[in-house]
Design a protein with these regions (language model features):
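Acyl-donor (CoA/ACP) binding surface of acyl/acetyltransferases
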Residues: 1-21, 25-29, 67-180
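A short helix-loop-beta-strand connector motif used in the catalytic cores of GNAT acetyltransferases and
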Residues: 52-65
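Conserved GNAT-fold acetyl-CoA-binding loop/helix
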Residues: 31-53
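Generic structural signal for secondary-structure transition and capping sites
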Residues: 31-32, 56-59, 121
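Short, hydrophobic secondary-structure boundary micro-motifs
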Residues: 34-36, 63, 177-178
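Hydrophobic residues in alpha-helical segments
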Residues: 26-27, 36, 55-58
Length: 180
């Protein structure tokens, strides 16, 4: 199993042991879910179902939970997906509110960029953020992403219509800034 790590966090596949931490830190947090595509979870039984779905998804996709190195606690999730020959997109990116403002989001995004450009040899990384999610937009811009386009999207679980802003980073720009 691949484990990716940076100074303060690491990524690895989920396990049922992480259910309570993900429920408390992410899935039940309405402030986080308002910018995400998952429905907030209201009880531990639903969190167990969500974790089983996450584990199943991660078996055939590049999805991970994010862990705090100091505590080994699950504090978020992240993933990338192949969208064309050598283009990749983030498939979700989230850090628990209690861990925000510590630079973990940037460490997380840089880990994903390293996976896409250094390991998978991708040409382009696509990042999407809900219009108004200034923390997410500022994060991708701080890593060199540039605005590409916008589209109106309807979130499935609550039929909420929003504008999804799309940002891109090319391998050439990544390698000139962070290259290995």
């Amino acid at each position: 199993m691949n484990i990716y790590e940076s100074e303060h966090i690491y990524l690895k596949k989920a396990s049922m042991d992480d259910t309570v931490a993900m429920y408390q830190n992410v899935w039940s947090d309405r402030d986080i879910s308002k910018y995400m595509n998952f429905k907030p979870i209201d009880n531990l039984d639903d969190a167990k179902i969500m974790m089983q779905q996450s584990i199943e998804y991660q078996k055939s996709n590049m999805g991970f939970l994010v862990y705090d190195k100091e505590t080994d606690e699950a504090i978020g999730f992240a993933g990338v997906k192949n969208v064309s020959d050598s283009d990749y997109a983030e498939s979700g990116l989230c850090i628990a509110k209690k861990c925000q403002g510590k630079g973990y989001g940037k460490e997380l995004l840089l880990l994903l960029l390293s996976i896409v450009f250094d390991e998978l040899h991708g040409d382009k990384f696509i990042y999407a953020a809900m219009e108004g999610n200034t923390v997410s937009i500022n994060l991708c811009r701080s890593c060199g992403f540039v605005y590409d386009s916008s589209e109106t999207v309807i979130r499935k679980w609550d039929n909420y219509e929003y504008v999804s802003e799309r940002y891109t980073l090319m391998a050439k720009q990544y390698l000139s800034s962070y290259g290995s």
